[in-house]
Amino acid sequence: MRINPPTYGSEISSIEKKNRGCIVQIIGPVLDVAFPPGKMPNIYNALVVKGRDTEQMNVTCEVQQLLGNNRVRAVAMNDTDGLMRGMEVIDTGTPITVPVGGSTLGRIFNVLGEPVDNFGPVDTNTTSTIHRSAPAFIQLDTKLSIFETGIKVVDFLAPYRRGGKIGLFGGAGVGKTVLIMELINNIAKAHGGVSVFGGVGERTREGNDLYMEMKESGVINENNITESKVALVYGQMNEPPGARMRVGLTALTMAEYFRDVNEQDVLLFIDNIFRFVQAGSEVSALLGRMPSAVGYQPTLSTEMGSLQERITSTKEGSITSIQAVYVPADDLTDPAPATTFAHLDATTVLSRGLAAKGIYPAVDPLDSTSMMLQPRIVGEEHYETAQKVKQTLQRYKELQDIIAILGLDELSEEDRLTVARARKIERFLSQPFFVAEVFTGSPGKYVGLAETIRGFNLILSGELDSLPEQAFYLVGNIDEATEKAMNLKT
């Protein structure tokens, strides 16, 4: 069990001192390599295939099994096209090692920590291996505290835990990317923190779109790259399963350095955690393991736990993780999402219905949940106000069928008042984002939690019943809503 923070530094020894073996079998992305007796590499060591004669291959593999007879089985992190039996393989003597620290900000990396954005080499003076122990119990910060994001609907109805794990659910086109970018922007401005984005097994186009939008919104500063607020690590769905299985660990290793050495608060995004499980399932089958339920790997819980347990708060800093969760065939009992749910502290569900109404962020206030929304953690006032808001919205939801058939006039006076307040609440949950300024022309707003609670209390108390509901749409705090109402009257 590791007690002291890890040491970071140049961890690769010179090539001359390394063990050399040769390929004896290739089955797709899996290689069997023979080494001299007594020179066997350790499990998880990185092996590099150098090619023959003048042919430079540079295919990196990771040792997964020791087979006996001085052979190991390794999984490739790159394409294995062009590899042949008999090619020389070098044991690096260490697991995959990636650059960490400030030089990673504003750059895009692959699973091996190599920059893939054509902006030249990255400073590799400070590096770290991707396989590490979770922090020891005595290092953990066990105090429950809210991680304020400045986004009203999140902080008020489904608050994030500092050092916690949040599941992000939502289909295409409901504002997932914009929400992620706003969180990256707000953690940098309000907490002096940084973010790491791990693209695990998703579309290359989506990764490119995210990068372009980040440049447009200023999250990545092209002119002064060190001013950027995020490092990007991609292992997209066209890559071998080994790369997709390990890219989450590469992103996490970069985040751990910011937490342990720079003592910062870090946001780690993983998109998509299901693809991490899927890649592990592919690798497991390639290695000949007996599949478990629904064809998943027998080590599913162990693999998920080894990733998730490293995401936590320590006395130095915190890693708060937001993980997009794909639910195959909408089956929440599928082993992949079911194993993920066991680790989550909160869920943020994006609703297509709210997005269609133009309410952004389109976070569903009734479906999103958080274990932090308890009176002993958030306080009585916050808890009571949140419950009243949810009750009002739930009643509005129940009345919508009656309104659609009979109209508002058929409702009782009390129900009409509930509907009016619920519509104001729904609009007040929307908010202009800093990263969307370039598209909307409206300046972004960061709203503190105390301001948010005050605003909802005023709506629930009936003090603002006379204001039109459009005054509450896309504003920051409640004072802006009253000001907007005055402007609408004039």
Curated annotation (Swiss-Prot):
Superkingdom: Eukaryota
CDD domains according to UniProt: ATP-synt_F1_beta_C, ATP-synt_F1_beta_N, F1-ATPase_beta_CD
Signal peptide: none
GO molecular function list: ATP binding; ATP hydrolysis activity; proton-transporting ATP synthase activity, rotational mechanism
The keyword Membrane appears for this protein: yes
Entry-linked PROSITE patterns: ATPASE_ALPHA_BETA (PS00152)
Localization per Swiss-Prot or TrEMBL: Plastid membrane
Assigned EC number: 7.1.2.2
InterPro entries linked: AAA+_ATPase, ATP-synt_VA_C, ATP_synth_F1_bsu, ATPase_a/bsu_AS, ATPase_alpha/beta_chains, ATPase_F1/V1/A1_a/bsu_N, ATPase_F1/V1/A1_a/bsu_N_sf, ATPase_F1/V1/A1_a/bsu_nucl-bd
Pfam hit, one: ATP-synt_ab
Entry membrane topology: Peripheral membrane protein
GO biological process: proton motive force-driven mitochondrial ATP synthesis
Record field: catalytic activity: ATP + H2O + 4 H(+)(in) = ADP + phosphate + 5 H(+)(out)
Binding annotation for ATP: 170-177
Keywords: ATP synthesis, ATP-binding, CF(1), Hydrogen ion transport, Ion transport, Membrane, Nucleotide-binding, Plastid, Translocase, Transport
GO cellular component: chloroplast thylakoid membrane; mitochondrion; proton-transporting ATP synthase complex
Stated family: Belongs to the ATPase alpha/beta chains family.
Chain's role: Produces ATP from ADP in the presence of a proton gradient across the membrane. The catalytic sites are hosted primarily by the beta subunits.
Quaternary organization: F-type ATPases have 2 components, CF(1) - the catalytic core - and CF(0) - the membrane proton channel. CF(1) has five subunits: alpha(3), beta(3), gamma(1), delta(1), epsilon(1). CF(0) has four main subunits: a(1), b(1), b'(1) and c(9-12).
Protein name (record): ATP synthase subunit beta, plastid
Organism annotation: Cuscuta japonica (Japanese dodder)
Phylogenetic placement of the source organism: Eukaryota, Viridiplantae, Streptophyta, Embryophyta, Tracheophyta
Protein's gene: atpB
